[in-house]
């Protein structure tokens, strides 16, 4: 997960092991692609296949995360420039505040029981950013959308967005602080969310 020009996060999970991450980091450092690679050892749990099932970025400062798994007890190792220079962190908060002092960590399910667990299972943390502060989410995760609305985001459906662009009521270049929702009844049958379904090839 590319956080910014300097930082890359990779989750070590049931599907991604530490050896592969360190080999990747070594190649990236030698080619001077990034300055820091952060290895986050996420729980070995079937609901946590990859890092983006627990944590995704929607703006330069805002991230949606699953609080029960990401707040405490994580083993986080950051490699700085090479594999010999390492820094460890006690949790995602400590790590993120160092990278981005203005960070806002927005809880999946609005940190409400039992919605947080249900919505994490339904890809409630899994957003894909179209641009800074404009991201796509499943429409079904209502409490997560509620948390975003409370923090100043407007929620519109993909249909509303497309109609607004077509009629000239919405200028996509000026769009900001917006979550675009898509229906998920068929997509969720195979698992994964909007971030899982995309592969950015070029990012600013």
How does the language model describe each region?
Residues 1-204:
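The feature marks the mature, well-folded catalytic cores of soluble enzymes
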């Amino acid at each position: 997960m590319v956080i910014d020009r300097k930082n890359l996060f990779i989750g070590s999970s049931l599907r991604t092991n530490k050896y592969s991450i360190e080999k990747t980091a070594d190649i990236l450092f030698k080619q001077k692609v990034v300055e820091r690679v952060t290895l986050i050892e996420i729980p070995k749990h079937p609901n946590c296949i990859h890092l983006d099932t627990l944590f995704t970025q929607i703006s330069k400062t805002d991230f949606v995360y699953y609080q029960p798994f990401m707040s405490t007890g994580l083993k986080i190792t950051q490699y700085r420039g090479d594999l010999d220079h390492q820094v460890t962190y006690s949790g995602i908060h400590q790590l993120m505040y160092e990278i981005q002092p203005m960070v806002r960590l927005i809880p999946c399910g609005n940190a409400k029981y039992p919605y947080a667990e249900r919505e994490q299972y339904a890809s409630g943390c899994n957003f894909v950013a179209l641009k800074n502060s404009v991201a796509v989410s499943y429409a079904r995760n209502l409490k997560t959308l509620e948390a975003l609305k409370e923090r100043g985001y407007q929620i519109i459906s993909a249909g509303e967005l497309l109609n607004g662009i077509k009629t000239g009521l919405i200028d996509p270049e000026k769009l900001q602080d917006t979550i675009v929702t898509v229906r998920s009844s068929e997509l969720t049958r195979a698992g994964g969310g909007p971030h899982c379904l995309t592969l950015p090839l070029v990012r600013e």
